[in-house]
Amino acid sequence: MRIFKTYGQEAIALITENPYRLARDIRGIGFRTADQVAAKLGIAKEAMIRVRAGLSFGLAEATGQGHCVQVALCAPTGRAAKRLTESTGLEGRTIHRLLEADPKTGGFKRGEEHPLECDLLVVDEASMVDVLLMRSLLKALPDGAALLLVGDVDQLPSVGPGQVLADIIGSDAVPVIRLTEVFRQAAQSRIITNAHRINQGQMPELTAPEGSDFFFVEADEPEDAARKLLTVVQNRIPKRFGLDPVRDVQVLCPMNRGSLGARTLNIALQQALNPPGAQRVERFGWTFCPGDKVMQVANDYERDVFNGDLGIITAIDMEESALTVSFEGRAVEYGFGELDELVLAYATTIHKAQGSEYPVVVIPLATQHYAMLARNLLYTGVTRGKRLVVLVGQRKALAMAVRNGNARRRWSKLREWLQGSSRGSSTRIGPQAA
């Protein structure tokens, strides 16, 4: 009875879609009961929805009464922190927010003298963390606390110096668990299987059987690729899959510049999907209009929006010189002078998308991007797509990216210091050594 009072006429549909919502929404129903309902509905034990619910339950139990384990969850970007919250049901914060960044000093309030209050610190998307930020994080870790780093070492390394996650794994100084098994549902996805092929230096399967979620649209010249990309985004994906070309589709580019770069494609996609009308504002090299998809490009803790967050412009008030953006239903207002925090986001770079996921990803590939065509870049782009991935461009460019697995080595001495420490060396690992 409580179920129908909570969900109304949509109770059956909602529970069938996600039975684990029962544990979240209805008092007296826990994970185990919801899990029994899921089993009766035929949800497999290894289904991702069950994994997420189980993880949330496990963390909640660890932090619950009687266990006295304080768990802190963080990620390097706001978008990744939000995904962490959605996956676990616990609060995920950016590393900067966790460490209480001080804009006046450029440092952090949390450190050796004022450490974090946790027994277990979980860092997601750890491949994105550079040596300087990791140093600050470790200095703030209290004595006796455990650190769990979660990340995909095969993705792009951090924008800042070092390759912390790769060096930690390569040192053999700490326990490492590699998740390599592809479960049954995932094995049916061409996105997953082709991502694994790319990561192993093999060309992805480009033939698209019925029901495929991975496509390759060949185009010999960049101009042809740009035209085909616009057609795919504007017409083919909405008609065939019933998806919104603005809200559901994200174009990810290897580079920002060039005819197939993010900036040029943003302007072309804006013209195709949301042509500027009379109500517009031009600032910082962009034209903003109601209905445009935009990206926040800096962490703004006062507005509670973060680097990489996507939103839709809902209103422009010329009298007040203000623009309103909806971020997942939450309205945020910007003065015209603050619009340097926003860029059009129909297209963005793969680097900028790291740590995010999108329903549909479209990736242009051309030999003009030769300087950036690398296996880890392509792998990172492909793994951003949840329901559909479309590559548009030259087969030669795709092959160049797959073959180029020689990521530039970054020298930070972290691996050597860790190896020396694990052998009982007198090498000091800490602020002085760094």
What are the functions of these language-model segments?
Residues 84-89, 110-118, 288, 353:
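Conserved motor-coupling elements within RecA-like helicase/translocase cores
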Residues 142, 287-290, 306, 353:
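Residue-level recognition of short, solvent-exposed, well-ordered loop/turn junctions
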Residues 153-303, 314, 323, 421, ...:
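Conserved helicase motor core of P-loop NTPases
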Residues 1-66, 70, 434:
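Accessory, non-ATPase domains that flank or precede helicase/AAA+ motor cores in DNA-metabolism machines
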Residues 78-82, 96, 100-106, 115, ...:
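Conserved helicase motor core of SF1/SF2 NTP-dependent helicases
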Residues 65-98:
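Conserved P-loop
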Residues 62-66, 70, 74, 302-313, ...:
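Terminal-proximal interaction/regulatory segments of ATP-powered molecular machines
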Residues 200, 296, 307-434:
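C-terminal accessory regions
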